[in-house]
């Protein structure tokens, strides 16, 4: 089995769990407040800022450099959305939630210790954005009564065909010079990334403590198996 397929199979349960959080299910039904949504946009800004900052450091790395793909970057789009939701002084207003900060800290931690694990975070975030972005854009637009503003996050102006691009992305994953041990560690990290996303979503629903305990216990169990 190639690495892209192993990564997909190895994160299937976590992916499904993330899609079934109360926040995501409400979002998919079009039940979301503007306040919750702009808080999500704010948290995503900090997550992507960390991920993209760290990937730039490794853009010439023999492994990570292959996934330095500026056309995927979301920070500029999120900045535009935050300006819409919070106004021109948004930088002095927004701050990461506790759940978001844990996510950001984890990204920086692996960048400094085992940088190849960043691949798990890269995969979890960007492939998901490409896969469901247009559907989520339509839901958010209708639920929040938006026109053309506040939705830049879902727009990939430099990617003409998401389906073809995802195949290219998977091909890059398959060609990465990784050992079996590194691949397994990346799959474990990708599962943890999904859990960190779930913690962020649950925080928006007010279930942060229970969610965080589940995340930590799940991560510990994954390390013991």
How would you label these PLM feature ranges?
Residues 1-225:
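Metal- and O2-centered redox machinery and metal/ROS homeostasis
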